[in-house]
Amino acid sequence: MNIALADDKVWHKGKSYRKGYTTGSCATAAAKVATLMILRQQVIHQVSIVTPSGVTLQLNVEEPLIHGLQASAAIRKDGGDDVDATHGMLIYAQVVLRNDATITISGGTGVGKVTRKGIGLPVGNAAINKTPLQTIEAAVREVLGPERGADITIFAPEGEERAQRTYNGRLGIEGGISIIGTTGIVTPMSEESWKRSLALELEQKRAQGMEKIILVPGNHGERFVREQMQLDSELVVTMSNFVGYMLQEAERLAFRHVVLIGHLGKLIKVAAGIFHTHSHIADGRMETLITHLALLGAPNSLLQAIYACNTTEAAMELIEAQGYQEVYNTIATRICERINQMLRYSPQPFQCDAILFSLDNQPLGSNRPITDIVEALR
């Protein structure tokens, strides 16, 4: 186990969570120890590296092998208490000394290949991100000195199977995992890393020339787009609860048309100016629904009944019974107004639309006819 992180924890809601280290740190440590083993011609069972964040990791080495001027070694990925798809897998490096001072880094079995533009790596390259490329080269150069070189191959036998649990397929990374990590350290409960992974898909689609995008909270939204709107799911990007962040990213990337599509219970919060829709941040669903119904002249008895509802689905039954379904269109319109207010100082504002649906995947309302929105997206 890594000694430096043994007592390094973060606190969240009164609980402590142990930090871990990234696939990039694993690859760096594996490459470093394999190089050391070649030079010393002996097996090494522990290796230390300094991560980009300045944290020193002392890591156990698994499956060390030496064969003349080449060696390989593995480091087991430990995500701490942030257990992701790569937690517990072995990341290997094979190092072969060269006759010149060049250091090359490539991906082998289980490391994905980049098949689309937009993630900061050339198409056809291994999915080894910029920071790990730098740390791997620096660690090996430190061991070899300036006069020697090596060919380094990073591989992960479980990578192809593990990658099926990640966003790699959507990002155009095929055949394996990504070797990533800007700090080298995994911080549990980190919203920033989650948000960044979502924004990466936006960046990729913009790099492909796309100017129109659909943002959805999750899988239900994508299903609605596919089944009810008959649109290509390539238009869809998941925003999770980070509505404001993803809208700002879409504005930064100069998308021309952004459509929010989601269940009433999630997107109604945006109509109230709540741009982080997780329940631990804010609720306001019933209050917002009641406000818009009151503006339509709904009777006090309906408002009182809806205020007592625990879910928007329950409220929808009461709304339908009394014929106030128009409220969904007014809420969708208000969502777009809130977004325009948030981005009012933008030098390049995008066109915004909003569509609300129910749990049974049926459209409820929109800021303008859904057929017009679909036509604009084609």
Swiss-Prot record:
Domain of life: Bacteria
Known catalytic reactions: Co-precorrin-5B + S-adenosyl-L-methionine = Co-precorrin-6A + S-adenosyl-L-homocysteine
GO molecular function: cobalt-precorrin-5B C1-methyltransferase activity
Enzyme Commission number(s) from the entry: 2.1.1.195
Pathway recorded for this protein: Cofactor biosynthesis; adenosylcobalamin biosynthesis; cob(II)yrinate a,c-diamide from sirohydrochlorin (anaerobic route): step 6/10
Enzyme class: transferase
Keyword set, alphabetical order: Cobalamin biosynthesis, Methyltransferase, S-adenosyl-L-methionine, Transferase
Presence of the UniProt keyword S-adenosyl-L-methionine in the record: yes
GO BP terms, alphabetized: anaerobic cobalamin biosynthetic process; methylation
UniProt xrefs under PANTHER family: COBALT-PRECORRIN-5B C(1)-METHYLTRANSFERASE
Stated family: Belongs to the CbiD family.
NCBIfam families: cbiD
Entries under HAMAP family matching the protein: CbiD
The name this protein goes by in its record: Cobalt-precorrin-5B C(1)-methyltransferase
Organism of derivation: Tolumonas auensis (strain DSM 9187 / NBRC 110442 / TA 4)
Gene this chain is encoded by: cbiD
